[in-house]
Structure formats: structure tokens, C-alpha cells
């Protein structure tokens, strides 16, 4: 996959949806120059969430995390672009909002780690796994934005 075709999985969590932050989050990724290739508005089942967070299943906070993520609708998305996984994580800010810098999504919009409004893949491999878990191949839209020549050399 070409470097500017890298994909990441980003999901607005229930608190981000309830607070009306979906548009602001999408706007930040669009303004950066990343391309949206998939988006859903859904209420995730506990089974799906348990698969998504399987690597955390032994942690004491796991049941609470699954319940929180199942407490309202979420907005899973797939974004594409050059170094989108790394840059996306930087845009999100630290997992704990108290450690997030102003200008990051978490630094600007949240206070506590238990309500940190957004998830982002931490590596290309986890992005591929998460994208396959939440979207089927037909839901990933291939298109060319008119602005691409103004973003990439």
C-alpha cells in the first residue's frame, strides 16, 4: 500500500457523540488533509466491543469499559493518508486527557480518562484488525478528493 494510502480506525465514543463533538472531530481530520473512506453511526453490541478490546480483557477496568462503550451510539470511521496512524494518534492526544496538550482533541474537549471521547488505532496492524472488525470491504469507499493534488506532491 502506498504511504499516502495508509488507513487508520478512529471511533467517537458515546460521550463524544452525546456531547455533539462528531462534526468537530471529522472537521479536524478533513482539515489535516486526510480522506474519509468509511463512517457509521451505530450502537455497538457488547460482543463486538469485547472483540474490539480483547487485548484489555484481563484488566480490572474491562467490564466497565465495555459497559461505557455500550451505553450509547458510537461513530466508527476509517481515515486514509500519509502516516495517518501516527498523526491521528498525535491529533487525539494522550489517552489520559490530563496529559493531553491543548490543540489535541482530548486536550481541548475532555477532562477524565474514563470519558476521553475518542479511540484511535495505535499501529498499522491494529488499524487493519479494527477496520476489518467494524467494516466489510464494500463499506470502504475508494474515491479521489479534488484537493489531493494540493495536499500531496
Swiss-Prot record:
Homohexamer. PROSITE patterns: NDPK, NDPK_LIKE. GO terms for molecular function: ATP binding; GTP binding; kinase activity; magnesium ion binding; microtubule binding; nucleoside diphosphate kinase activity. SMART domains: NDK. This is Nucleoside diphosphate kinase. Its main location: cytoplasm. The modification N-acetylalanine is found at residue 2. It catalyses: a 2'-deoxyribonucleoside 5'-diphosphate + ATP = a 2'-deoxyribonucleoside 5'-triphosphate + ADP; a ribonucleoside 5'-diphosphate + ATP = a ribonucleoside 5'-triphosphate + ADP. Its cofactor is Mg(2+). InterPro entries: NDK-like_dom, NDK-like_dom_sf, Nucleoside_diP_kinase, Nucleoside_diP_kinase_AS. The modification Phosphoserine is found at residue 126. GO terms for cellular component: microtubule; mitochondrion; nuclear microtubule; plasma membrane. GO terms for biological process: adherens junction organization; CTP biosynthetic process; deoxyribonucleoside triphosphate biosynthetic process; epithelial cell migration, open tracheal system; establishment or maintenance of polarity of follicular epithelium; GTP biosynthetic process; microtubule-based process; mitotic cell cycle. Belongs to the NDK family. Major role in the synthesis of nucleoside triphosphates other than ATP. The ATP gamma phosphate is transferred to the NDP beta phosphate via a ping-pong mechanism, using a phosphorylated active-site intermediate. ATP binds at residues 13, 61, 89, 95, 106, 116. The gene is awd. Mutations cause abnormal tissue morphology and necrosis and widespread aberrant differentiation. Changing residue 106 to C: In KRm7; lethal due to loss of phosphorylated active site intermediate. Changing residue 127 to T: In KRm9; lower enzyme activity. Keywords: Acetylation, ATP-binding, Cytoplasm, Cytoskeleton, Kinase, Magnesium, Metal-binding, Microtubule, Nucleotide metabolism, Nucleotide-binding, Phosphoprotein, Transferase. The active site is at 119 (pros-phosphohistidine intermediate). Changing residue 130 to K: In KRm4; lethal due to loss of catalytic activity. Its EC number is 2.7.4.6. Pfam families: NDK.
Amino acid at each position: 500500500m502506498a504511504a499516502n494510502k495508509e488507513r487508520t480506525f478512529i471511533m467517537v465514543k458515546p460521550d463524544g457523540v452525546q456531547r455533539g463533538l462528531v462534526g468537530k472531530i471529522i472537521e479536524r481530520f478533513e482539515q489535516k488533509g486526510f480522506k474519509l473512506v468509511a463512517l457509521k453511526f451505530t450502537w455497538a453490541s457488547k460482543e463486538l466491543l469485547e472483540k474490539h478490546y480483547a487485548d484489555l480483557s484481563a484488566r480490572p477496568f474491562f467490564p466497565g469499559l465495555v459497559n461505557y462503550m455500550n451505553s450509547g451510539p458510537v461513530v466508527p470511521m476509517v481515515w486514509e493518508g500519509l502516516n495517518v496512524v501516527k498523526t491521528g494518534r498525535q491529533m487525539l492526544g494522550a489517552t489520559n486527557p490530563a496529559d493531553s496538550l491543548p490543540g489535541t482533541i482530548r486536550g481541548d474537549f475532555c477532562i477524565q480518562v474514563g470519558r476521553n471521547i475518542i479511540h484511535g488505532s495505535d499501529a498499522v496492524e491494529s488499524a487493519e484488525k479494527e477496520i476489518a472488525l467494524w467494516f466489510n470491504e464494500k463499506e470502504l469507499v475508494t474515491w479521489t478528493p479534488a484537493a489531493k493534488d494540493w495536499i500531496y506532491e
